[in-house]
Amino acid sequence: MDFEQNEDINGVRFSWNVFPASRTDANKNVVPVGCLYTPLKEIEELAVVSYNPVVCGGPHCKAVLNPYCEIDVRSNVWACPLCGTRNHLPQHYANMSQEAMPAELNSTTVEYITNRPVQVAPIFFYVVDVTAEEENLQALKDSIITSLSLLPPNALVGLITYGNVVQLHDLSCTAIDKCNVFRGDREYQLQQLVEMLTGEKSGGNLSAGPQMKITPFSLNRFFLPLEHVEFKLTQLLENLRPDQWTIPPGHRPLRATGSALNIATLLLQGCYRHVAARICLFASGPGTVAPGMIVSSELKDPLRSHHDIDSDNAKHHKKACKFYNQLAERAAENGHTIDIFAGCYDQVGMSEMKKLTDSTGGVLLLTDAFSTAIFKQSFIRLFSKDEEGYLTMAFNASMCIKTSADLKLQGLIGHASPVNVDAQNVSDSEIGIGGTSTWKMASLSPHHSYAIFFEIANTAATASLMGDRPKLAYTQFITAYQHASGTNRVRVTTVANQMLPFGNPAIAASFDQEAAAVLMARVAVDKADSDDGADVIRWIDRTLIKLCQKYADYNKGDPRSFRLAPNFSLYPQFIYYLRRSQFLSVFNNSPDETAFYRHIFTREDTTNSLIMIQPTLTSFSMEEEPQPVLLDSVSVKPNTILLLDTFFYILIYHGEQIAQWRKAGYQDDPQYADFKSLLEEPKLEAAELLVDRFPLPRFIDTEAGGSQARFLLSKLNPSDSYQNQSAAGSTIVLTDDVSLQNFMIHLQDVCVNGQN
C-alpha cells in the first residue's frame, strides 16, 4: 500500500488506512484512527476551478460534490455519500456526460475560486522592541525594510515601537513624525483606546470598519496602503534608535512587551475585525513590565527554568500565561495572526506567549540575534512567493471536516483555534482541540499540517459489505481561505476508507507506521504541555507494548521468537528516539527552547516530523558512494564524514583521520583532488537541504574531538557507551541512556511475558 501516493494527491496520511468496523475494535488497535492533513499542500496538476462549490442540501450535512457521489446524468441528480441525500445539480451541469465530467467529479482534491471578492487588502503590523543594542537593532531595521519590498503594494501597514513606553506611529502625518505614546505598565481597554485616539466615546458600538473612510481622526489612520507610505515608513524605521531610558546598574531594560501586544490586538479589533492581518513582534529580551511581565527588571531575579515552573516557583509565569492567552483568544477570534521573532541570547517569554502563535497560525522563531543568518533568511522566507508572484501565505482560513455517519471527530492538534458550531459528528472524548468540527486558522501556509483524530461511531461491528461493495467511511476536508491574489478560495479534499471487522489482515496491512508515530508524538507533545514528563513517557511505553502484543508474532515466554511485520518493524525505533527527543526530554533546555521546538513540530508534515524524531545520518567516504547509515555510535568512524540532519540543525562531522588530513591541507594539493571533492560533497548536500526549509536550520561544521561534536553524539544511539565498549573503530558515547538494543530486548521480554 503506497501511503505516500495519497499524501501527494490529497495531502493526507492516515495511521490506519483500513478502519475497524466498531469503536471497540478501534480501541483494541491502541493507536487511534487519525490522519495528518496539509490543507494547502502544493499538489502537482491541482484542479482549480472558477466557480462556487455545489453543496449538499441535507440537514446538518453541507458536504461538497465529489467523485464518490452517485450521479444520475439523465435526471441531473446527485446522491451525497456522506448523508445519502439526493440533490439536484445546478443548471450549468445540464450538458454533463459520463465522458465529460467536471473537475470535482474526477479529482478528490479541488480548489474553488469563489465569486466573493476580498474587501480589504491584508494588514502587516510591525511591533518593534527598541531596547536592543544598536547593532542588533540596525540588523532588524534592515530586515524589516527588505520585507516591505516583498509585500503586495496595496497591503496596509502599521508600526508600533516600544521600550518602557509604547509608541503608535501615525503614518498619515507626512510633514512631521507623529506618534501616540502609551504607558507601558497599563492594560488598556478597547473603549479607552478609541477615546484616546479619536476623541470619541465608542459606547460599545464602533463606527470604524473595513469600509470606513480614513480621516485624520479615524482609528484606521494607523494602517495605510504601503504604496502610499513606503517612503515615510522606511524613513521612520531608519531613524529608530535604541531606547534612551536610563538602565540602572544591575537591572534589565524596562520592556513593555505585553502592553505593546495588547494595544496592537485592540487596535486591529477596533477597525479591522475579521480582516486578514499579521502582527509581527520583534523582541530583543523578556518583558519586564506588567502586564505580561516575564521577569522583574532586577538582574538578581533569574529567568524561570522548567524546574521553577514545575515546582510553582516561577513568580510571574501563571499571570503572564493568563494575560497572553487572553490576547491569543482575541486575535484568533478576530482572524488576526501573531508572529514572534526573538533575537537575543536571553529568553523572551515564548513559553508564556506560545498560545499567541499556536492559536493563530503564526511563526515562533528563536534566534541569538537579529544579525544572524537564521533570523534574516527565515524572516524573508515568511514572504516567499509562488510561481505567479503571490505570497504563499494564506489568511483568515477555516477548516470544516465532514464525515459519514460511521465517524466522529475527537479533535485536532495543530496551530488553530476552535469554532463553536453545532455539529452531529463530534465525539464526547477529546484529543487536542475537540468539541467541534470546525477550526479557524488566522494564517495558513503550504507547510502547515494538522493532526486530526477520529472515533468510530458504531458501538458494535456492522456488516462490512453493502451488497457486493465494501463498506466505506467518508471524510471531507473543506478549507476556506483568503488567497494573496485577493480572491477567496475553498479547497476540498474527499477521501474514503474501507471498514472491516477486527482481526481482518487488511487492517494490519494498512498500518502506516510513519504517520502513526507522528500522530502519537503529537498526542504526547500535547499531553506534555500539561502533564508530568515522566507520566507521558510511561503512557507512550504502555501504548507501544500493547500495540506490539496485539500485532507481533511470538511464542509466549520466548523473546527470541518475537517478530514484527515490515510495516510495524520501525515503529518501536521511532518511539525510542521520541522518548529521547527534546520534545519530551526537556532537561538542558530552557522553557523558551521547549516552546519553540514543540511549536515547529506541531506544524510540519510526516516526513519533516520524522526527521525531528529520528534525525537522518549520511556517511561519505573515499571507498563508497554516500549512503544512509544507522543513527548509532557504530557509524562514527575515523575515515568517514557524517552529515546529520535534525531539521533544527544540519551538522557535518569529520572523522579523526579526515580531520587530520584536512588540517594538513591535503585538499589544497592537486594530487588529492578526490579528497577535496569528498570534503565538498556533504556541503553540497547540506545546501540542498537548506533550500526550502523553514525556519532556516543552524549549520555546524565540526570534527572528532571538537567542542560541537556533542550535537552529533547526543543524538546517537549509544551502542558503544562507557558501559559497553564493543565495536572497534567506533566512538564511545558517555551516557547513561539505555541503548536501542537494550530497549528492544526489554520490549520483547515484556510483550512475550504478557506484562503491561
Swiss-Prot record:
Component of the coat protein complex II (COPII) which promotes the formation of transport vesicles from the endoplasmic reticulum (ER). The coat has two main functions, the physical deformation of the endoplasmic reticulum membrane into vesicles and the selection of cargo molecules. GO terms for biological process: COPII-coated vesicle cargo loading; intracellular protein transport; positive regulation of ER to Golgi vesicle-mediated transport; positive regulation of protein exit from endoplasmic reticulum; regulation of COPII vesicle coating; reticulophagy. It holds the Pfam family Sec23_trunk. The COPII coat is composed of at least 5 proteins: the SEC23/24 complex, the SEC13/31 complex, and the protein SAR1. InterPro entries: ADF-H/Gelsolin-like_dom_sf, Gelsolin-like_dom, Gelsolin-like_dom_sf, Sec23, Sec23/24_helical_dom, Sec23/24_helical_dom_sf, Sec23/24_trunk_dom, Sec23_24_beta_S. It comes from the Eukaryota. Keywords: Cytoplasm, Cytoplasmic vesicle, Endoplasmic reticulum, ER-Golgi transport, Golgi apparatus, Membrane, Metal-binding, Protein transport, Transport, Zinc. Belongs to the SEC23/SEC24 family. SEC23 subfamily. Zn(2+) binds at residues 56, 61, 80, 83. One of its GO terms (molecular function) is GTPase activator activity. This is Protein transport protein SEC23. It is found in: Cytoplasm; Cytoplasmic vesicle, COPII-coated vesicle membrane; Endoplasmic reticulum membrane; Golgi apparatus membrane. It is a peripheral membrane protein. One of its GO terms (cellular component) is endoplasmic reticulum exit site. CDD domains: Sec23_C.
